[in-house]
């Protein structure tokens, strides 16, 4: 009798556990960066790339801007088609320049 009761309770617990709803998925918050801050980041990226490639900032083209969960990246190239990526933190502070 105890075995029947025990099996019934275990089956009931298993069924209750299967019907539990999964927690909602979390989505990353998208913060907006101001247009003036974006322009400042672009100017800083161009200046850093111009210094690295020993050319003028006017010969540097920024071709892309991507926002990630905790950082930003600006892609660009020189007039000689040399690619680079500028990385910024979540506050828009320059981190580093990567040559590609």
Curated annotation (Swiss-Prot):
What Pfam families has UniProt attached to this entry? YsaB
TM helices/strands, residue ranges: none
PROSITE patterns associated with the record? PROKAR_LIPOPROTEIN
At which residues is a lipid of type S-diacylglycerol cysteine covalently attached? 18
A GO CC annotation recorded here is: plasma membrane
Question: Keyword annotations for this protein?
Answer: Cell membrane, Lipoprotein, Membrane, Palmitate, Signal
Membrane topology recorded in Swiss-Prot or TrEMBL: Lipid-anchor
Record has Lipoprotein as a keyword: yes
Q: Where is the lipid attached (N-palmitoyl cysteine)?
A: 18
Q: Where in the cell is it found?
A: Cell membrane
- UniProt superkingdom: Bacteria
Signal peptide span per the entry? 1-17
What InterPro entries does this protein map onto?
YsaB-like (IPR025728)
Q: Does the keyword Cell membrane apply?
A: yes
Provide the protein name. Uncharacterized lipoprotein YsaB
Source species: Salmonella paratyphi A (strain ATCC 9150 / SARB42)
Record gene name? ysaB
């Amino acid at each position: 009798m105890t075995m029947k009761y025990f099996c019934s309770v275990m089956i009931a617990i298993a069924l209750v556990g299967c019907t539990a709803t999964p927690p909602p998925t979390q989505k990353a918050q998208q913060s907006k960066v101001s247009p003036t801050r974006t322009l400042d980041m672009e100017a800083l990226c161009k200046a850093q790339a111009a210094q690295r490639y020993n050319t003028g900032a006017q010969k540097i083209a920024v071709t892309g801007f991507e926002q990630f969960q905790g950082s930003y990246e600006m892609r660009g190239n020189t007039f000689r088609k040399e690619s680079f990526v500028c990385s910024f933190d979540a506050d828009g502070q320059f981190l580093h320049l990567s040559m590609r």
